[in-house]
Amino acid sequence: MVTHRQFPNHKVFEMEIGGRPFTVETGKVAELANAECICRYGDTVVLTTCTANPIPKAGIDYFPLTIEFEERMYSVGRIPGSFNRREGKPSERGILNSRIIDRPMRPLFDEELRNDTVVTCTVMANDYDNPVEIVASLGASIAIASSDVPWNGPVATTNVCHLNGRYIVNPSTEEREASDCFVCISSTFEKVVMIETEANEAPEAVVLESIRIAHETNMEIVKFINGIVAEIGKPKFTFEKAAVNHDLLDDLMNYGLNQIEYALDTDDKNVREERLTAARLDFQEKFGEKYEDFDTHIEVCLYKMQKKVVKKWLLQGKRVDGRGMDEIRPLAAEVGVLPRVHGSGLFTRGQTQVLSICTLNTLSAAQKLDTIYSEETKRYIHHYNFPAYSTGEARAARSTSRREIGHGALAEKALLPVIPSVEEFPYAIRVVSEVLSSNGSTSQGSICGSTLALMDAGVPIRRPVAGISCGLISDQETGEWRTFTDIQGVEDFHGEMDFKVAGTTEGITAIQMDLKNKGLTMEIIADALERCRKARLEILSEIMLPCIAEPRAEVSEFAPKMLSMKIPVDKIREVIGSGGKTIQKICADTGAKVDIDDDGSVFISAVDSAAAYAAKKMVDDICFVPEVGKIYCGKVVRILPIGAFVEIAPGHDGMVHISKLENRRVEKVEDVLNLGDMTYVKFMGFDEKGRANFSRKDALKEMENNK
């Protein structure tokens, strides 16, 4: 006997976002998870689940939250291109999407929660126009908020772009690519908790208005989510907060807070670490025997003591290294620091130092992407490496972290708006930023270093790009807050915000904002944007432009020489030849490499310019089509009793009839022309058989009249 399964808890909720329906289904699938939902926006569908371990994880001092963004190739009707035809590790964009979901949610969890929590977002259908990251972010917020996991959400996430003077909520892929400013904003009902921006040198006012519109949209979505939670939400479980020995903390505060102040009061990270180590040893000698659990709690106590000092100082307008609130650390910039590489730039800001190296190659070296997104290739690539030695740690190298991928992507999108088009500069471009020393804001250092390396490599970028970060400290009781420019490591660690802004003298190209508090008001955001604008202009004018004012006129002698041209589509077959014989001969004769696209774009690369231009001439000769009425200089290649054949380009000859040789009667062709002679002829057109006809007498007459 078969019984039909019922789903008594199945519910459907719907609202309109950006003029399109957004639908949420719950209570039908994944019933063993703490919470689940299926979100649909257009034809983009994402399944989101939330699971949590009821038992706290021992021996850790952080909240173990994991966001998994699962990309499924079936969502776009494709089979993976891997050997086993199965999805592997997440794509770079998938990792970036997981970070977009993680960053606004993490600050809203209790920092003393220790239960493993995993949110999994599986993309089940993707229509390309309704963004998967928005659907997944909203699904994650709904799943966590309706689960039994303690959380101070919900949050909502919205994209907004500025296109032709209009602000568009959750734009299509086409609208996003055509816009001059695109923002991805996460916020609670009250405040903004995450900002991600890519822009084409957008003014601060446009960015700020985009953020405001996104926040207003998010407020309506938060109301919608709260309605769902009110109907299906589970009671939150109670948890035991991470234990802190308050007696030890009180003793340390009374005895050693002045030692912590002394340790922090320096602009040298090494000196700071030495002083903190000395203070810890003193505390251990003083209280190690009194408290048996001293070793268990000392790190937490030291963290709280440092945070107390840093917060007090910043609210008073004092910084650990003695700088003013708008003062940038000492800067240095240098280009051409490595031999043989195509371009290099060393950028130093205080004890943060980044070496960026630029490599140029043929367009065939562009990164090919096999993902669920519409982008198929990536011509400009930026990679960011953060080795352990940059922070003085003794740790073996490991695989690329999500943080490294995120920082590399930030620098990549910061420079992308100023990268020349393929037509202007037909190269694939890769920049690698090696962090040599880290004391805060290495991602912004890599942006500055990348600009230097690109200019040193002769890449004709539209304008130099610089990056700077802004910090925040606030007092929740009094409402007092302060922002400060160019955060260093200890300010990043104990502060509440890392507001990273990149741009040119004309406007913003990228923003990434991370928070450790419950959100920002529009007033704080506006203040941070203005602070970063002033600092960015100072870095460009005082350090970077004096180092290298404009891109090199020529690419490095060690870089391949590239030329691009366009040929008629109907000529592609002739250039390639039967079985590729013609194009292979061009490559063999010149030593160049020739690539042809279906639209007739031709890209020629060679080790030297002479070889590249030789290959270009051979392609030009094959595609040559004479213009009726135009005069050409050609070589006599054959003589017949009725006329002479003149070749005006390799493989392109035609007949000059004996009657068209001179203005007088000619008895014999050899009386005027001989084999091998060079002569001017005028192209008169093709006959019914497609043969070219030339006239020498018309050419001479026209040339005489033009004297």
Region spans (language model):
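Extended amphipathic alpha-helical scaffolds
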Residues: 2-53, 61, 238-374, 560-574, ...
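Flexible, glycine/charged-enriched surface loops at secondary-structure junctions
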Residues: 111-117, 152-154, 221-239, 270-271, ...
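Long, charged amphipathic helices and adjacent flexible linkers at domain junctions
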Residues: 235-246, 538-565, 613-633
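Conserved phosphate/anionic-ligand binding catalytic regions in large, soluble enzymes, centered on
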Residues: 35-37, 130-149, 335-358, 439-459, ...
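Single-stranded RNA-binding regions, centering on S1/OB-family and related RNA-binding modules
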Residues: 558-560, 569-707
